[in-house]
């Protein structure tokens, strides 16, 4: 196979490949023979139709299919030989066969390479690891906060304040034209403690029942509602009800009996374990994010536009599916945020981890994978069903394999960099602005 490689400024990488005409003609002949065996044409017995007649009847369509298959076959042989990792779908271009005397057909393929990346100065990277100390008093406070209480919401005739529960109706307009399909009634939420857009929270403060509020927002280009994408939408909000919370001890929690101490002890241990588990997940993720961020700061890592757009589309599909499955509200904050930062974060992590795996020739340890499966399955009512599912499902096996490889790669990174420990108390952990690291929150 003959090929010629070049790099275009705008079109990415390009390779020109030559396919011998004898290869094309032989493939065509084999296809014509297959058709003759299975197709009956008027005037000829089945299997006896002359190749010339088959060629005249089916030639154009078959030639296109055969040449398409050969172009793909030769191109993927080329990337295998050159050990090239491509992104997305390559674009094929057939050259005009002006010189009939040539012994080959010529075509070009434009493709984008997966970024090549070398990690430098890894030992110079410094990050902070947060260690959180939880005291018995912290756990007792947590039990007290989460023990069985009955919340009563009492309607009030006062202005809306933070942490009030508010019920609203709303409708939306584009260029003063109402879009009726998005009308919503009786939407309740707790002010300043919800997952809705910030504009709603601060616009509604200090208003009263029956007040009508207007505000305008521009919907994101990747909002799940295609009809609203990139549009300036005006919301008309009417406040239906304002309520304030009153906490009451339930009858159950007021009963003092012999079993209460056992229950408290059980709650104590469960809450202690849960707190440690959640804190470890959040602080480990925080540490890993620092590592990736520091590596990107010290090393030039350019994300190919094709790879970036591909990941944007994947994330948009995930968001749209989630939006539909959860029957989400158009006011949900996460659907109004740019996908760019999340996509960059994902791709940086993916590229760096893959480079660590490649450089260190890491392989998935089956024993560790089995431990991981057992750990995951223990969270389900029927652990054996999860284990059986893993053994049967190829995609799940690949996912577990990738998780194990990522774990090994991240462990190597942690051993290579400088980690400075920071000791926090539980209160500092709770009051830290984790909102700037929303992906960490469980």
Curated annotation (Swiss-Prot):
SUPFAM superfamilies, sorted: FKBP-like, Triger factor/SurA peptide-binding domain-like, Trigger factor ribosome-binding domain
Segments forming domain PPIase FKBP-type: 163-248
Enzyme class per UniProt: isomerase
Compartments, record wording: Cytoplasm
Gene3D superfamilies: 3.10.50.40, Trigger factor ribosome-binding domain, Trigger factor, C-terminal domain
One Gene Ontology term from the biological process aspect of the record: protein folding
Pfam family name, one: Trigger_N
Coiled-coil residue spans: none
Function: Involved in protein export. Acts as a chaperone by maintaining the newly synthesized protein in an open conformation. Functions as a peptidyl-prolyl cis-trans isomerase.
Family of the protein in this entry: Belongs to the FKBP-type PPIase family. Tig subfamily.
NCBIfam families: tig
Annotated protein name in UniProt: Trigger factor
Upper taxonomic lineage: Bacteria, Pseudomonadati, Pseudomonadota, Gammaproteobacteria, Enterobacterales
